[in-house]
């Protein structure tokens, strides 16, 4: 059938293409095939299908091919987008039109694609940044700098990159005044807060988090800081971080970027010659420092290790008496996770962005997402096909920079940490030597 076996469906007689229903089924089959193999889908389309469709359908199909091709990093996707003509594209399609143009450093196409997005999408930090970069590349310095200036003061991946592009050093905001005893008592007395804390004590983390989020949703900065401090005192690190993250004018970055289990994590980072801010940045994103955290995929602990991975590493490093029930122990999880992170970094020339992508999605995928030629690190990250991994790498890398600032460590810029992602051929040549 068209959805289950699209290639077989497209290979059969095309008599049904004379009807609207038949053409719709063909589009279903082409769409399903294009998800895994855009080039084969285009081959079927060009072979004997394209001319059987009206113009509007042809443009729709080309836009679909182009979006799938861009996700697969196919250079020809740029031309496929052009074959879609002036058909209105969704913001998601325009995002991928932008991303494939970024991989080719086709700045006019980057600018054009972003400017076709809806106003809401254009004002997202990611597209403000890349539109600003495109303007700078095209010689419109004043306009490009003005755009980057809109987000340069924001504390996230693209805010930091924009600030660096404008030559603005990282400055941690002045620490807000510590919540007073009265402010803490006022927040602690809230019925929702009392329910949340009681649920946490009962081990009902999901229900407790829901209650917490509802309780803090309309708080001002002072109340948020008091709630974050209350979470810290109670060892509820995920709520401390997420609540402190919500402040607008008054900030406490020691609550946004805390270092629980500091001795354990720092010891393992030093033992494996890892950048400590990277380790803390990764743990902040993986588990929010919840020692017994478990994911839907079965990963456990501070550094979210799968049982199979943990067993393999434990054998490798000679950890005696290991069983997966020990993954909730910070010292065990950190020892295994630090070893794995070191191995991943070594496999990718020490590049933390590639290592983070590999840690989240697997080394094989991280390798496949490279280009034949060298890529700017930020472009590699923005063109990761998986939305979850793309956001994960951005968070880990931004976390690393802010932890370095809070901890007083290596003050390298985010751009320098991202580095240049060597082309696939260059890395293969190095591996063969």
Residue ranges: model-predicted function:
Residues 1-40:
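Solenoidal tandem-repeat scaffolds enriched in leucines and small polar residues
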Residues 43-60, 65, 75-86, 91, ...:
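Catalytic glycan-binding domains that act on GlcNAc-containing polysaccharides
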Residues 10-22, 50-57, 82-85, 177-190, ...:
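TPR-adjacent "capping" and linker segments in tetratricopeptide-repeat scaffold/adaptor proteins
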Residues 146, 169, 174-204, 414:
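Acidic, serine/threonine-rich low-complexity intrinsically disordered linkers/hinges in large eukaryotic
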Residues 34-37, 69, 73, 152, ...:
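Alpha-solenoid repeat junctions
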Residues 1-10, 153-174:
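Long, contiguous interaction/recruitment modules in multidomain scaffold/adaptor proteins
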Residues 25-36, 65-68, 188-214:
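Alpha-helical segment of the N-proximal tetratricopeptide repeat
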Residues 34-35, 70-71, 103-104, 137, ...:
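Alpha-helix C-terminal capping/termination sites
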């Amino acid at each position: 059938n068209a959805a289950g076996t699209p290639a077989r469906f497209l290979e059969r007689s095309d008599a049904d293409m004379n009807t609207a229903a038949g053409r719709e089924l063909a589009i279903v089959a082409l769409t399903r095939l294009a998800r895994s193999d855009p080039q084969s889908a285009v081959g079927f389309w060009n072979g004997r299908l394209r001319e059987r469709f009206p113009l509007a359908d042809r443009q729709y199909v080309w836009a679909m091919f182009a979006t799938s091709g861009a996700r697969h990093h196919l250079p020809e996707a740029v031309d496929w987008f052009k074959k879609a003509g002036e058909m209105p594209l969704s913001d998601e399609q325009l995002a991928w039109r932008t991303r494939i143009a970024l991989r080719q450093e086709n700045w006019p196409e980057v600018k054009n694609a972003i400017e076709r997005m809806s106003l809401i999408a254009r004002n997202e930090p990611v597209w403000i940044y890349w539109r600003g970069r495109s303007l700078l590349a095209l010689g419109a310095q004043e306009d490009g700098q003005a755009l980057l200036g809109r987000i340069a003061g924001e504390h996230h991946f693209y805010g930091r990159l924009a600030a660096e592009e404008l030559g603005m050093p990282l400055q941690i905001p002045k620490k807000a005044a510590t919540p007073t005893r009265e402010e803490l008592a006022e927040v602690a007395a809230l019925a929702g807060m009392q329910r949340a804390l009681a649920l946490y004590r009962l081990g009902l983390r999901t229900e407790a988090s829901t209650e917490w989020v509802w309780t803090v949703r309309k708080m001002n900065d002072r109340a948020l800081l008091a709630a974050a401090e209350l979470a810290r005192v109670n060892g509820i690190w995920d709520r401390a971080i997420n609540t402190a993250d919500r402040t607008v004018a008054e900030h406490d970055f020691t609550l946004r970027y805390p270092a629980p289990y500091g001795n354990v994590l720092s010891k393992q980072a030093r033992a494996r010659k890892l950048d400590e801010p990277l380790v803390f940045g990764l743990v902040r994103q993986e588990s929010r420092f919840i020692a017994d955290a478990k994911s839907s995929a079965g990963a456990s602990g501070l550094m979210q290790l799968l049982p199979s991975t943990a067993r393999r590493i434990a054998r490798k490093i000679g950890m005696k008496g290991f069983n997966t029930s020990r993954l909730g122990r910070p010292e065990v999880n950190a020892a295994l996770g630090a070893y794995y992170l070191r191995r991943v970094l070594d496999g990718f020339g020490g590049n933390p962005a590639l290592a983070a992508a590999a840690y989240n999605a697997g080394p094989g995928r991280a390798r496949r997402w490279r280009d034949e030629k060298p890529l700017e690190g930020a472009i590699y990250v923005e063109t990761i096909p998986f939305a979850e991994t793309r956001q994960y790498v951005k968070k880990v890398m931004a976390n690393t920079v802010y932890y370095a600032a809070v901890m007083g460590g290596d003050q390298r810029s985010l751009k320098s940490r991202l580095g240049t992602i060597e082309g696939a051929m260059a890395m293969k040549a190095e591996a063969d030597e």
